[in-house]
């Protein structure tokens, strides 16, 4: 018989979700600065997208493995917390080493070191994020699920905004340099990653220490599971060929609406990845009028020197991209408040299509604006 899951206080829900702030802080720093870092380390403008392939590949590989493994784990730390803590420690390592890639030039080319650290960060963020979502689902009763997701959304947006603007703040408020020569990383970016690593580890440790997961028997009672059901989770897996066959059968039998949505999502992610990969060079060229030749490592290596105006423009543009990404997170948070009501009034398809259309127009509008304040 299913027992009633205890209700949590506001601060208990806050503690369960608090680590999301740190994880999203790290994601925001990565999204706004990885192209900037790799470009400074010597990546060609046209090869940046190859480095960014790491993110979806790691997501495809890591999330299902970690999700399945955490479902089968019960130890002194609990079910989800071991993965959250391990992922946070690995992510912190990547966040510290990535901006310091030039220090390892005796062992690895800085660009290769940077690529490896991006891979480590992406894998680690996924190790953190998947169990975090499951932890909220495990700990928060259905009657408080909306409150839980609201707090989660608030913390995610706070982390995204602060992480995005941090390099700008370190330069314009603290006074750190935001410029770097080829093969180096700007001090403001280096310190932003140090601070991000500290915030990530601190918030995750807070959640791990302040949250006590349910024991297996308690969890089974609250979720209405029998003793036999968890045991089936440890049953031997079907052969790979059988699992692939089942996967393609599921895809074939997927409802028509889901297939249509999959196509739309497929193309909409094009825009998101172009934004993450190329916003920094696009803003630098279009707003700061830096010629594209100054993104060519071969041209820079052959030039007698890089003009100070080019170096300063690249640094300022990189900081401003963080401001743009912070604004993106703020407006997304505001719009999400009204999204449900708009969908109820006009229908989900209409609201979704309108949102995509507005997003497309916003993309095109980058060509029309030549000033920072526009």
Indicate where each model-derived feature is located:
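Loop-to-transmembrane helix entry
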Residues: 44-54, 112, 150, 187-188, ...
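Residue-level signature of mid-helix packing/kink "hotspots" within the transmembrane helices
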Residues: 56-60, 64, 161, 329-337, ...
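Juxtamembrane helix-start motifs in multi-pass secondary transporters
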Residues: 82-84, 192, 348-354
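Helix-to-loop junctions at the C-terminal end of transmembrane segments
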Residues: 61-78, 334-348
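Helix-loop boundary and gating motifs at the non-cytosolic
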Residues: 2-58, 259-264, 268-296, 300
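C-terminal transmembrane helical hairpin of 12-TM major facilitator-type secondary transporters
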Residues: 327, 331-335, 341-374
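C-terminal ends and interior cores of transmembrane alpha-helices
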Residues: 83-108, 357-371
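Intracellular loop-helix junctions on the cytosolic face of multi-pass helical membrane proteins
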Residues: 1-10, 107-116, 127-128, 132-133, ...
């Amino acid at each position: 018989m299913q027992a009633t899951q205890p209700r949590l206080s506001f601060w208990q829900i806050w503690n369960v979700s608090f680590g999301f702030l740190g994880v999203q802080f790290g994601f925001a720093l990565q999204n706004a600065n990885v192209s900037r870092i790799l470009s400074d380390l010597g990546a060609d403008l046209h090869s940046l997208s190859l480095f960014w392939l790491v993110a979806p590949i790691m997501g495809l590989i890591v999330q299902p493995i970690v999700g399945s493994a955490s479902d089968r784990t019960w130890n002194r730390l609990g079910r989800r917390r071991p993965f959250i803590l391990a992922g946070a420690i690995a992510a912190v390592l990547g966040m510290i080493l990535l901006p310091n890639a030039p220090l390892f030039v005796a062992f690895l080319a800085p660009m290769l070191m940077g690529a490896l650290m991006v891979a480590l960060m992406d894998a680690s963020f996924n190790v953190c994020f998947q169990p975090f979502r499951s932890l909220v689902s495990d700990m928060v009763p259905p009657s408080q699920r909306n409150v839980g997701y609201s707090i989660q959304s608030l913390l995610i947006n706070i982390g995204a905004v602060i992480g995005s603007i941090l390099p700008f703040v370190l330069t314009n408020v603290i006074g750190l340099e935001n410029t770097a020569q080829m093969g180096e990383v700007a001090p403001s970016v280096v310190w932003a990653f140090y601070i991000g690593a500290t915030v990530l580890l601190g918030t995750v440790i807070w959640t791990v220490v302040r949250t006590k997961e349910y024991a297996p028997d308690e969890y089974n009672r609250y979720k209405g599971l029998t003793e036999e059901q968890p045991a089936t989770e440890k049953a031997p897996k079907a052969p790979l060929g059988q699992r692939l066959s089942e996967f393609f059968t599921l895809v074939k039998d997927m409802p028509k609406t889901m297939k249509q949505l999959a196509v739309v999502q497929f193309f909409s992610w094009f825009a998101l990845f172009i934004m993450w990969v190329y916003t920094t060079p696009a803003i630098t060229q279009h707003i700061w009028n830096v010629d594209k030749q100054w993104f060519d490592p071969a041209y820079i290596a052959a030039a007698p020197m890089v003009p100070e105006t080019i170096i300063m423009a690249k640094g300022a543009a990189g900081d401003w991209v963080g401001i743009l990404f912070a604004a993106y997170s703020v407006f997304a948070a505001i719009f999400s408040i009204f999204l449900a009501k708009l969908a109820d009034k006009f229908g989900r398809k209409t609201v979704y299509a309108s949102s995509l259309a507005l997003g497309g127009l916003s993309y095109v509008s980058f060509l029309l604006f030549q000033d920072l304040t526009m």
